[in-house]
A protein has these predicted regions:
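N-terminal Sec-pathway targeting helices
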Residues: 2-13
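Beta-propeller blade termini and top-face loops
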Residues: 29-947
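Hydrophobic membrane-insertion alpha-helices, especially the h-region
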Residues: 12-22
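Bacterial Sec-dependent signal peptides at the C-terminal "C-region" and cleavage site
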Residues: 21-30
């Protein structure tokens, strides 16, 4: 049935009211509301709106797709890493060390002075990132209730001396460093940022020293071991003896630099002995670099390390083989037929009854035991699939009343075979017998732990048993989307040793809109005084449970009004929901940890920002430095406004997935315009897409070609028809309808892509990496490709699209680097001049060094001049560039903050005080308002008021 957008919105809102009222009154909804809510339930089946999700599935089945990047290891991260490494295949550790040294040198010079430069970087949030209440999220799908989100958080630790008035909790935000609250049990914990001086803000391990009863001694490992596209490699380990107020480190740089420390264990009774498990790291964090495919020549082998002098020195012990010697070099670990793990050791644990016994879980090599402190090793549980490099075993050990050591193992990879929970009740000696406690049969009690991490175990997985409670075990992973007889089983709890479990993912506060955990789980701890109260970190930050349970099994019967459940499914639903938390509470208020990809600013209000974030969607603020609101779920890529219509917005998810909005970001009004470009050409994971800064309704996007629309993507459709057919939530997407009227500019066909042979035989391939329109005219556009080609078009508005011409500028120079172009800023006064930033390393292109260039095109002579303005910048990959066209000051973003080259100077310096050492993914400048915004990938958004 075709419905107008406004009518549908009204009907669904009314339906929601009726459903809530009916649930309260214990009434069964009428048949009409059931049918409406079946559609409503379908909208929230996944982290994308259902209408577009179904449409994209159809698009993906069409022949000729070549640019779509499936989520999973080896997609975004591989692309981003190769962009940073290009033209090489990898990045030596020496390059990384040189970049850090260069950044430290620049920071040591102080800040620029003169011309009124008194500004300080300030965070503009969000520290209260609000998912507002909406009909588009419910218990049938994604984060069902209003809640405050945080950025991806990967590790946490709780003070052993936790009481209602004083309970310290530490978390590691994936790109946002270490944070602490001293009142984790309060209604609103207060958070402190602790790691501003760390060499990098990425990490995934925190361990308290069990030998310090005060809980003041803790170790944190840098480098995120989760293998996502923005899981940055680390610099080593840091130690604090005062609860995180001060730190020493990095410890073990020779062993850990260029790797990710996924697990740390300090030996009870011997505080000088520490174990650390490392994995292959990822390089960089911004939207133009990174990658889990890296080997990092010059870095130490990944695996298990041991220190016996408090972290001063480290010895390699193990990487999935019986002897250390078999795997103590990268060459051995990567050799064909190697017995070693290709990714490393993800988890280490010490036997609770014998500190000489150590356990290690390594990717694709199962779980191993050493009875002599790591000297020799025996495999005690083989991998589910030794041929799958992503097969990840998580483990937890505990002591049984009889003194034996019990081990739980949660293992999985990309879904085949499905993940499962194992248990052995005697692992310290002999050959342990592990029991598979999981079952794919819904009728079996073991179904609760079946496939908990679905196809993302390489990224989402944990198993945790509270000390002193061996029968209590928590298992975490990712949402089981489409499973209507559970609460998605993101986290499950068993109190009988893993035999049966109940669903902890949503609480009992409401049937349709309970509080819920984010879909992607990473780690969990419990209150030392209550094993049923958990604190959990995920891609949405940190959550806390009430520590009490309620029976929500009646919700299963209510669900049958909306979905069909078999008798077996209904019985399993009642069991899974028979014990759920009475309440789940977000603890994210005060945490500024969102991982922005970029920021856009309204031309009508310099305080009105949008930004896309990793796995937390797109956000908007009218200028509140604390509170932003989510305007679209899922992944968040690029965003923007229109030159003339203040109500217009656009955003992308990933790849070429643009939506447009005509209602100021109202979630109901996002409309798909991606049909001609989604997957049709090679494309970046986050494609460059812009609104024309001068011409209203015009937009440009880069894939293989630069594409253009002059109608906001609507084509000849009226707005009403467009919303009816192409709306993300309600669109009918009828056969024959094309949502989006993008057209490729210039020479058609594969050869005519900006990456193709029509523009030369060199630097071919890849995709368009940057697109920028001049603000001084209506006809000039600059573009660049992944392989370092740079173009200008002087007639980008021409009709037909084949009349648009591009001139390749890099081929007109001899000093331009053959590296990835990360940013373009076009001169507001001269559209033929631009400043271009380069990622990668000078050491990769020694004859053409430089990270920031001033490029001027002479259209009459057909020439271009390239002036390297890097000066003393050093070999630091630049992630973006922005110029203050009023003063001539030039700003460059890096993985170490923002640097400035003052007009007329050859001396790069830190742009301003106030910003910690953090990776900056993008810069957005508003010279007329004297504002420079920085999108950080882990510490939210920042503002520098310009002189």
């Amino acid at each position: 049935m075709k419905r107008r957008w406004s009518v549908v919105q009204l009907v669904l809102s009314l339906c929601l009211v009726l459903l809530v009222a009916g649930a309260v009154a214990g009434l069964r909804p009428d048949r009409g509301s059931i049918q409406r809510d079946q559609a409503y339930r379908q909208m929230t089946e996944r982290k994308m709106p259902v209408a577009i999700a179904k449409h994209m599935k159809r698009l993906q089945s069409l022949p000729g797709l070549e640019g779509e990047h499936p989520e999973g290891p080896g997609s975004a991260e591989a692309e981003e890493f190769l962009s940073r490494a290009y033209p090489n295949d990898d990045i030596p550790l020496a390059y990384l060390d040189a970049a850090r040294s260069a950044a430290a040198r620049l920071k040591g010079k102080g800040f620029p002075r003169g011309r009124g430069r008194t500004g300080t970087w300030v965070t503009v949030g969000p520290s209260e990132a609000l998912y507002p209440a909406t009909i588009f999220r419910s218990s049938f799908g994604y984060v069902p209730n209003r809640y405050v989100a945080g950025g991806r958080s990967t590790a946490l630790a709780i003070d052993p001396n936790c009481s209602p008035g004083h309970c310290r909790l530490w978390i590691f935000a994936a790109g946002g460093g270490v944070w602490r609250t001293k009142n984790a049990l309060s209604g609103q914990p207060n958070w402190e940022f602790l790691s501003g001086d760390f060499g990098i803000q990425s990490g995934s391990s925190i361990a308290l020293d069990p030998n310090d009863p005060s809980g003041n001694t803790l170790y944190v490992g840098t480098g995120e071991a989760n293998a996502s596209g923005d899981s940055a490699a680390g610099v080593g380990m840091y130690k604090s003896t005062d609860g995180g107020n001060t730190w020493t480190g990095p410890l073990g740089a020779s062993a850990f630099a260029g790797r990710a420390i996924g697990s740390i264990a300090v030996v009870p009774g011997d505080p000088s002995t520490i174990y650390a498990g490392t994995t292959r790291g990822v390089l960089g964090v911004s939207s133009v670099n990174g990658g889990a495919v890296s080997l990092i020549p010059g870095a130490a082998a990944w695996g298990l390390y041991k220190s016996t002098d408090g972290g001063a020195t480290w010895t390699f012990l193990h990487n999935g083989a019986a002897t250390a010697a078999a795997c103590d070099t990268v060459a051995e670990a990567t050799a064909v037929g190697s017995p070693c793990s290709l990714r490393g050791v993800r988890r280490v644990a010490i036997d609770p009854t014998n500190p000489s016994i150590v356990y290690a879980g390594s990717y694709s090599r199962g779980v191993w035991r050493s009875a002599d402190g790591g000297a020799t090793w025996t495999q005690i549980n083989p991998s589910l699939n030794a041929a799958d490099a992503n097969m990840r075993p998580e483990l937890a050990v505990t002591t049984l009343p009889n003194g034996a050591t019990r081990m739980y193992i949660h293992e999985g990879s990309t879904g085949n075979p499905s993940s499962r929970l194992f248990r052995s009740d005697s692992v310290a000696t002999g050959v342990p017998a592990f029991v598979n406690l999981s079952s794919s049969n819904v009728a079996d009690n073991g179904y609760g732990t079946h496939n908990v991490c679905t196809g993302q175990c390489w990224y989402d997985s944990f198993v945790y048993t509270p000390a002193g409670h061996p029968d209590i075990v928590y298992v975490g992973g990712s949402y089981s989307y489409g499973e209507n007889f559970s609460n998605k089983r993101g986290v499950v709890l068993s109190t009988d040793g893993g035999v049966t479990s109940t669903d902890m993912t949503m609480d009992a506060t409401d049937f349709l809109h309970p509080n819920g955990l984010h879909p992607d789980q990473h780690a969990l701890v419990t209150n030392p005084n209550n094993p049923y109260q958990f604190f959990e970190v995920n891609d949405g930050g940190v959550m806390r449970s009430s520590g009490e349970f309620a029976d929500a099994s009646a919700n299963c019967d209510a669900r049958t009004a909306f979905v069909t459940l078999t008798p077996t499914q209904l019985a399993r639903c009642r069991q899974l929901l028979s014990r759920v938390p009475t309440e789940l509470v977000s603890l994210n208020k005060g945490l500024a940890t969102l991982q922005f990809q970029s920021l856009s600013v309204s031309p009508f209000n310099s305080n009105l920002l949008q930004g896309g974030t990793q796995d937390n969607g797109t956000w908007q603020t009218p200028g509140n430095p604390v509170k932003w609101e989510n305007t679209m779920i899922g992944d968040g890529g690029q965003s923007g406004f229109d030159a003339a219509d203040p109500a217009f917005r656009f955003h992308t998810f990933f790849n070429a997935t643009p939506d447009v909005n005509f209602s100021g970001g109202d979630m109901a009004d996002w409309n798909w315009i991606g049909d001609p470009i989604f997957g049709t050409e090679p494309q970046s994971f986050y494609v460059p897409i812009i609104s024309d800064p001068v011409v209203s309704r015009s937009m440009f996007v880069g894939t293989g070609h630069v594409w253009r629309t002059k109608t906001w993507g609507m084509g000849a459709m009226s707005l009403a028809e467009f919303r009816e057919k192409c709306n993300e939530w309600f669109g009918t997407f009828p056969p024959g309808t094309v949502c989006g009227d993008w057209q490729p500019l210039g020479i058609p066909g594969v050869a005519g892509r900006l990456t193709g042979t029509a523009y030369g035989a060199d630097r071919t391939g890849g995709f368009v990496a940057a697109v920028e329109r001049a603000t001084g005219d209506a006809t000039t556009l600059w573009a660049a490709t992944q392989t370092g080609r740079v173009f200008i078009s002087k007639n980008v508005d021409a009709e037909p699209v084949t009349a648009v011409t591009f001139v390749r500028l890099d081929s007109l120079a001899t000093n331009d680097p053959n590296r990835f172009v990360s940013g373009i800023h076009v001169d507001a006064a001269n559209p033929n001049r631009a400043w271009i930033s380069y990622s990668g390393f000078d050491a990769s292109t020694p004859t053409t060094p430089g990270h920031v260039f001033e490029v001027t095109y002479n259209p009459l002579a057909g020439t271009a001049t390239w002036v390297d303005v890097s000066h003393d910048f050093g070999d630091i990959p630049a992630t973006d560039v922005a110029r203050d066209d009023d003063t001539g000051d030039l700003y460059a973003a890096t993985d170490f903050g923002v640097f400035v080259l003052a007009a007329g100077s050859t001396d790069w310096q830190v742009a301003a005080p106030g910003m910690p050492n953090v990776e900056v993914a993008g810069l957005t400048i508003v010279p007329s308002a004297r504002k420079l915004y920085a999108a950080t990938h882990g510490l939210s958004a920042w503002l520098l008021n310009l002189p």
